[in-house]
Amino acid sequence: MYWPMSVIGVHIVRLFGMELSRHTLARACLSAVVVSGGLVPFHFRKHLPVWVRVACLALIFASIGICCVWNFRIMRSHVENPPEWDFRVFWMYGKVLARHGNVYLPSEYQEFKELFQSDTQFTEASLNVGATYPPHSMLLFEPLGFSNIHTAYLLWYVLQTAALLAAIELLRRIFLGGSGVWGLGLAALLLFALRGTWVTINFGQTNFLVLLLILLYWRDHELPRAGVWLALGILVKLYVVFLLLYPLLRRQWLVVAWTVVSSLLLAFASLLVLGPTTFFSYFTLHPASHLPSWVYSERINQSLLAVILRSSNRGLGSHGPLAQPLFLALALLLACVTSWLVYRLRRRCEYGLALVLVLTLLLYPGTLVHYTLILLIPLLVIWEYREDFPGGIWGTVGLIAFVYGSIALQQGDSTFAAMLLVWMVLAGLAVFRTQNLQTIQPEGSDLLTAPH
């Protein structure tokens, strides 16, 4: 179980070999310190004097308040002057749909070239491609087209803020239950200390909605209605479909059935809204295949595929993401190991679900740095079972702080390395838990074979 620490050491050495600015290092250190400063007093809160508890809570909520003020300023600035990425793309989808245009035809977006005076990358990846989201996702974007971009952005931020607040409360209930105001403060602090939160707000992205829906699925993952949350998550971000691996391996057929039925209902609703021509254009035009190759290797992309492409100094060329041999081999290896562990785990199956979640971030070819907002769930699983981790509380705090710092660096492949490290730690804990149960439980014990 000590081998993940060697990985951390190697990564630290590699980071010191980079040309890091003082600003970058300060940002990474601040993120790590803030996280540590929240986790440690939370763990020892029952043993602290009253005045220390009050002081710690005051610092936590003061930090949250400062973050809220800064993010409010970002939102206000973007509502007044919407930046190029990403909300502008969502709003264009809505405008095309509002006039009953085909959102998957690049010709529908030519009017926006003069309106926005876009740069080359925006033109190549958006205006010359058309919508890359599947038809049922357009149910989320169509209402944006009935307002001007400023009003639409304001309403969009209201929706995302509501999702963020709901996600904070769910994080408290699921992973920090019984801790009251401490849990609420820690959940909010961990979210705001994660760089993905700031990037999500800056881009106007949908990660808060995805986080909320995944948390709802996590809460209900043993109930059939969990399939509804998965279907809605797939509507917001297509990569959520990877999470179906978990109910399939656990043979939760009702969850799978509810996911399929809910997805079909959403698809039928989008068919009625978009019309058959636009709906089937997604499948005949294959808009994602027209994306420029640099989308899969740009620095903001921290997927396994992007790391391989950058390391080899080769683009996709004429091949698609699924035609890269090294990517296929490594993806298959990670998927097989994850599947085996999920299948073997019977107790503390949260490790298995967390493994599938991290695997999704690693393998999805379009994983961007702000998708790491979802990584908070696996980290809280590790925190919840910190007695399993080498070093206990201190080892767990060190790991989480290091992951936060690596993500905040945003240098090279540091975000990918952080995600891979979390996967390795979870895999190690799952193996340890499986072997420990086999040693402790007598052969044929029901505890070992009964799903938890």
Where are the model-predicted features located?
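Primarily membrane-embedded glycan-assembly and transfer machineries that use lipid-linked glycans
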Residues: 6-226, 250-376, 384, 437-440, ...
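Aromatic-enriched
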Residues: 68-69, 381-452
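Hydrophobic transmembrane alpha-helices
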Residues: 148, 234-244, 378
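Transmembrane-embedded, aromatic-rich helix segments that form part
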Residues: 227-230, 239-250, 260
